[in-house]
Design a protein with these regions (language model features):
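An alpha-beta-alpha
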Residues: 34-36, 52, 140-187, 289-305
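Hinge/cleft segment of the Venus flytrap/periplasmic-binding protein
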Residues: 278-324
């Protein structure tokens, strides 16, 4: 499920989005104030955002009970700091942080309001919690950690003779580094040579991809926000070179990568929404509520990409969700 910019705006209006800056915790109509921050717009994060709101609604927190302040940093770290300061001043009842950078920004600024995170690979490594099983902070939520090893293995299912794995990810995202390290360790165990490229912004993706042509047999991209927002740029280089791309997020496969074994980000958002409702109901506290694993994983294959690359879909993926 993809939440477009227009849909996000409509959702904000539907839920009574407002910029209360007076430090009041609730609006005058008694609704709970929910603040949502998303690092940038791309399919997986948009789906998590919509899922979060739907999860709240399922637990009784619909438009009649909550006022939602939706903020999107558009990939700019300085915007995240401004948004965090806004939330600190407005003091909402609960904050939802979508992505690791968004969660780090609000958690660094705010220590006394509950924060529910989603689309975050590892809360503990990102220093959002003391441990994933016992946070001891004002942050908890749902991680988006998929099975990196099996995601890499997808490449070998399509290309059994492959010897060279390409890795491309953002140098500024700790979530991506975690997964890249896992991928490199797994590649070493399989005897694969790894060619690694990092980017600092979407402007670096084309050059990084071009430098891999002729050097790799297939590429793996983790759940990286920078790359996820520009998959068409990546496959514009890799498709003509007949280099398949396997990814950590469902939206990346929908946008042109060949395949993914991924968290369902919409359902993960719903799961986070349920946790948020439990916080609002006083049933749980963030500091003693373990970070949850995603409940749903799915295999996604882009049929158009497979056809473009001239690759047959392996038998074990015949029942996968087909897109493209």
């Amino acid at each position: 499920m993809k939440l477009t910019a227009a849909a996000l705006a409509a959702t904000a209006l539907l839920y009574g989005c407002g910029g209360n800056s007076g430090g009041e915790k609730k609006t005058t109509d008694g609704k709970k104030q929910i603040a949502v921050v998303q690092v940038m717009q791309h399919g997986s994060l948009d789906a998590a955002n919509q899922g979060f709101l739907d999860g709240l609604k399922e637990r009784g927190y619909g438009a009649d009970k909550i006022s939602v302040d939706q903020q999107n940093a558009q990939g700019d770290q300085s915007n995240l700091k401004t948004i965090a300061s806004r939330f600190k001043a407005n003091r909402p009842d609960l904050i939802c942080a979508i992505s690791t950078p968004a969660a780090q920004a609000v958690a660094n600024e705010i220590h006394d309001l509950p924060i529910i995170g989603c689309a975050i690979t590892d809360f503990e490594t990102a220093k959002l919690v003391k441990s994933n099983s016992w946070p001891e902070t004002n942050v908890t939520g749902v991680n988006d950690r998929g099975p990196v090893e099996k995601q890499v293995d997808m490449g070998l299912k399509f290309l059994p003779a492959a010897k060279r794995l390409g890795l491309i990810y953002s140098s500024s995202e700790v979530n991506s580094q975690i997964q890249a390290d896992q991928a490199k360790a797994h590649a070493a165990s399989l005897g694969l040579t790894v060619v690694e490229r990092t980017v600092s912004s979407v402007n670096d993706i084309q050059q990084a991809a071009e430098s891999m042509v002729g050097q790799v047999d297939f590429i793996y991209v983790p759940t990286d926000n920078v790359i996820a927002s520009s998959i068409p740029t990546l496959v514009k280089v890799t498709d003509p070179a007949k280099i398949p791309v396997f990814v950590g997020a469902d939206s990346m496969a929908k946008d042109g990568a060949l395949g993914s074994l991924s968290v369902d980000f919409y359902k993960s958002g719903v799961q986070a929404g349920h946790m948020a409702a439990d916080v609002l109901d006083g049933k749980i506290k963030t500091q003693d509520t373990a970070v949850e694993d995603p409940e749903v994983l799915e295999v996604i294959i882009n049929k158009k990409s497979a056809e473009t690359l001239g690759l047959a879909i392996p038998e074990e993926y015949k029942n996968a969700k087909m897109v493209g």
